[in-house]
């Protein structure tokens, strides 16, 4: 465990909301190794199961809208209306990805013009995707990164901004 910590301070009150230890190099490597180990299992999960998981995430955003909005209001000073809008949008991103995954991830036949044969474009997972998130839209930025990558079959590792870890 690192001796350095992230401190989340409510900008409106100056009060410390939470502290988190900064990950050590060894902890980061261990997290990468776990994500790498999970990638072979996750890429083989049937699309229908991935859709169900992403739909549950969308439902969590919907059912916890007030709580999640309050958290980013306290942690980063986001006005309540903006915060609830971000929570709604983040849930909607997950719902959209779940709903449209079958057609978005379907193989696409390519036009070969006058050439003989057939060619297809297939979307395949590439492995572990690392996302370094900015501070200003903590739910939205994660949703737009996580939902499509998880639907495709990639595993992800997030590094949140220090203002709202």
Regions from the PLM with identified roles:
Residues 110-165:
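Conserved small-residue-rich beta-alpha loop and adjacent elements
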């Amino acid at each position: 465990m690192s001796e350095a910590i992230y401190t989340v301070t409510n900008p409106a009150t100056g009060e410390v909301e939470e502290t988190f230890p900064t990950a050590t190099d060894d902890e980061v490597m261990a997290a990468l190794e776990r994500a790498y180990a999970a990638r072979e299992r996750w890429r083989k999960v049937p699309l229908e199961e991935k859709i169900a998981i992403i739909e549950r995430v969308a439902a969590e955003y919907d059912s916890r809208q007030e709580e999640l909005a309050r958290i980013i209001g306290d942690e980063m000073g986001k006005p309540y209306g903006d915060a609830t809008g971000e929570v709604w949008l983040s849930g909607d991103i997950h719902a959209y990805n779940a709903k449209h995954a079958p057609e978005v991830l379907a193989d696409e036949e390519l036009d070969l013009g006058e050439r003989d044969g057939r060619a297809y474009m297939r979307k395949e997972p590439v492995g572990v995707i690392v996302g370094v998130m900015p501070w200003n839209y903590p739910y939205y930025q994660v949703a737009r990164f996580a939902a499509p990558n998880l639907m495709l079959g990639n595993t992800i590792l997030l590094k949140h901004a220090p203002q709202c870890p």
